[in-house]
UniProtKB/Swiss-Prot annotation:
Official protein name in the record: A-type ATP synthase subunit E
Bias type Basic and acidic residues, positions: 41-56
Family to which the UniProt record says this protein belongs: Belongs to the V-ATPase E subunit family.
Lineage: Archaea, Methanobacteriati, Methanobacteriota, Stenosarchaea group, Halobacteria
Organism: Haloarcula marismortui (strain ATCC 43049 / DSM 3752 / JCM 8966 / VKM B-1809) (Halobacterium marismortui)
Any single GO CC term annotated in Swiss-Prot or TrEMBL for this entry: proton-transporting two-sector ATPase complex, catalytic domain
Length: 194
């Protein structure tokens, strides 16, 4: 074997080894690229899913916020209507006249007087425009006198001079008691179709 042949064999082996290394490097590079592309695809899919979740959350939040706003607007409208109805009832009570006003005033006065002893001297207060009515009605009660006006829709406030008891039987106080006790029923009736 000549030196030339040995050199050629070494070169061939070196070339083969270099080709082997190059092929292995190319294969490894392709694996790395494939892994990187797979990772990139996975990252992109995760980001897309995250963006979709974020968009869905924002959509749900906005929808929830819009529903809450609409509900609040409905509640405000209902409250306004209830306040209007309450105001209308107050106006109707303030506008009562004649026998109906006298009948209600007598009933409220009777109920108030029943809270006191028969021997008590009673001071009766009422609406300024009801003074004449109250003085006429009080003629039927011993120990009860008209004592002045109260800012109210009608009815009476009765106090005893002997005790520190005060009975508020004004139209206002009765309306507030009835209103509070029946607010749900009133609301249900007004808004039964909604």
């Amino acid at each position: 074997m000549s030196l030339q042949t040995v050199v050629e064999d070494i070169r061939d082996e070196a070339r083969a080894r270099a080709q082997e290394i190059s092929d292995a490097a190319d294969e490894r590079a392709e694996e790395i690229i494939a892994d990187a592309e797979a990772d990139a695809d996975q990252i992109r899919e995760e980001r897309e899913a995250e963006v979709e979740r974020t968009i869905e959350q924002e959509r749900e939040q906005r929808l929830s916020s819009a529903k809450l706003e609409a509900k609040q607007a409905r509640l405000n409208a209902r409250r306004d209507i209830l306040e209007d109805v309450h105001g209308d009832v107050e106006d109707a009570l303030a506008a009562l006249e004649g026998d109906r006003r006298e009948e209600l005033t007598r009933a409220l006065l009777d109920a108030a007087v029943d809270e006191f002893d028969d021997s008590d001297e009673l001071s009766v207060y009422g609406r300024a425009s009801d003074q004449s009515l109250l003085e006429d009605v009080l003629d039927d009660y011993d120990g009860a006198t008209y004592a002045g006006e109260r800012d109210c829709l009608g009815g009476v406030v009765v106090e005893s001079n002997e005790s520190r008891v005060r009975v508020n039987n004004t139209f206002d106080s009765i309306l507030e008691d009835v209103w509070e006790d029946n607010l749900k029923a009133i609301s249900d009736r007004l808004f039964e179709d909604q």
